[in-house]
């Protein structure tokens, strides 16, 4: 049988080490550092640090992600899923911008800059006024429109019973017709499909 | 590639089609009849001259004739090649193990190059003692070896609206299957001492994406591994060197690479990769979250659009792979007529929990059109659904978790195409 320890390996993490790496934020505000930033300052930082990819108003440049708008499109043929139209929690915006943006220069923004950018994103999504200031104190008062748009995986109850049945083996259908062809779209890289 | 032709003479139509290998095969066959096969009757250079010394390739690469067997990307799928995807060449592989250099890549901040001497793994949060491990520390824990598939949640995601990409590399190649050597995550968590309120973990990467996902404690204590070897050697840079998380059967995004920290908490974190991404939008505008398991799935890898039939009619080997995030694959059915009649395929090789399985179906091709499909059954009794069955539950905008049955149409010339059928 495998030894189950404890093995006495590793050493205790120091408070300053934990502080350096434990930067995650939760929807209930756990992990938020003290700080504040307003829409006006957020626009300044956004234009300087973010707009080259995401556009001046979060509309996205080229193929880079759209951050704003898209309200009431989630049942459309082509939904536009943004922080405003789709994301459930503001904490995710703060956490993700702080840990991974700007793309190529991650974890370079100050806490106040992240508060300011988050406030500006709220404003661009039409969720707060231009004089709004976001801080660790009022953070949990902000709710995003699609907070209730998600529910726990229900495949087990909904799909699995339907797909756990003995399948047909013979005379399963009358005929077969092609209804769609990838070759018509012709978007596969050329050199990959060879006749050798 | 040259093949000498055996069996039934190809039709004039096949000859005129000019498919390279079929044409070459016919040519060789004709020559062989005339004066013997020059591959036999003429002395080949590799028979006469000496080969490479043992010092030529300290770390060997595949034969130069296999240079087409490689990862490929599709540029239009993502905004840039850093936060992007490439694809395993499934149509060129056999058995169940994916060679390390061909395992597909998915990065969000590029493949980080980490000096293992400078790498640390921290465990903090709701634990008795927050800990820091060096790689040297990790190498002193008991190890386990397991073969698991890692499938990107978005594998086949481009196909929700219909047939789009022509080749199983592109439609199904966000997957690999390797043997991991690693430490049961349970042992590392026990070392720190999880408090009773600790119900979730948050693994985090050391790369510029600092990838995080919330994983329930039950799974963390069950079969997750902190792995440092794949197929016997160190993890490849692009697979998380020096250490990654292994989350058997669950969507690839959760297998955090360049693992630097595991936090224990009492609630999920709802981070970007489990809210904005890796949530499955349904037709009613609501979305499923925490869709962790990868359902049973299969694909025929040969023949397929990148691997047409070039040998003419007669004995033909159909092969493919099947897998399930919920167990093993006791059975795979295949059809050559679009699902009118199904046959049980033959599974060859090990049948391991949450691992790929290799299946074969040998048949006599009459030269007529083929509508090929495979249908996996897993050890829970689940049978792989059609794409239409999935769309009834989910619509076409859920992006992730498309495990619908794939159809290849093979025409009289042996050319295969990604299609959907009635």
Residue spans of the language-model regions?
Chain B
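Enrichment for repetitive, rod-forming helical segments
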Residues: 19-20, 251
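Sec/Tat signal peptide C-region and signal peptidase I cleavage site
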Residues: 31-33
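Intrinsically disordered/low-complexity terminal segments and short unstructured peptides
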Residues: 1-2, 7, 25, 46, ...
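Intrinsically disordered, low-complexity segments enriched in polar/charged small residues
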Residues: 17-18, 77
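N-terminal secretory signal peptides
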Residues: 1-14, 21, 28-29
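A generic secondary-structure boundary signal that marks alpha-helix termini
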Residues: 24-25, 194
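Structured, non-membrane catalytic/scaffold regions adjacent to prosthetic-group chemistry
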Residues: 35-422
